[in-house]
Amino acid sequence: MNSKLNSAMYSAHMIMRHAFGYNDYNNKYGRINDVYNKMADGKRLRLEEREVKSLRGLVCTLKMMIKNTDIITYDEECCICMAKNNRKEALPCQHNVCRDCYYKPMRNNCPVCNMEWPMRKDDKHAAPYGLAEYAHTYGGEEQRTPSPPVLGTVEGGDISPRLVGAIRTNDTWLSSRRDSPYHIENRIHNNNNNNYDENNPDDLPVIHPPRRRHRQTAHISI
């Protein structure tokens, strides 16, 4: 008896929550909850006339809602984790997101269509989304930080700003002597002799950017 009532109460809760809005259904749901508490004791109900009328009206409303409700099937994949057979959250954009992903730290927007989810913003059970989750959607202990560009000059001219912006290196490769003239000359010497160690980042060959060729124009006087 109690299991059937719990299932019925949950269904009524979800239907009323989506039909009346996420902030206006509390009073209506409270009426059904009062009747549920009395039915859970297994005794014959003793209701006032106003409670009976209110309950009948809500039952009729729920029946109308059920007729206009689309049945959600759990065979569809979650658009975040691609898992099936999980209970999905009802979203205004009609995309499928499982509850595990829905309550994790993420933006209040659909990852597929970028539609806003105002109800998630007001949900106290949803984890907030902050700067820590900006680069990594679900956060975690390890946060990725962008590596700094390689600065300095090499033989043959300065590195162009565009090339500097494109060169990225790991933090473990950086050292105080990486861009020193002696270190660069040593790497050039190893490169010419083909005796550098591929497993040692400091011995990797130095790549010289091509020199910029200036266009030569000839002025012909007539």
Swiss-Prot record:
**Key words, A-Z:** Metal-binding, Zinc, Zinc-finger
Q: Name one GO molecular function term.
A: zinc ion binding
- Where does the record place Low complexity bias? 189-198
InterPro entries noted in UniProt: Znf_RING, Znf_RING/FYVE/PHD, Znf_RING_CS
| Lineage: superkingdom | Viruses
Write out the biased-composition intervals (Basic residues). 209-222
Region (Disordered) location: 184-222
RING-type zinc finger segments: 78-114
The protein depicted here goes by the name Putative RING finger protein ORF118
From what organism does this protein derive?
Ostreid herpesvirus 1 (isolate France)
Q: According to the entry, what is the taxonomic lineage of the organism?
A: Viruses, Duplodnaviria, Heunggongvirae, Peploviricota, Herviviricetes
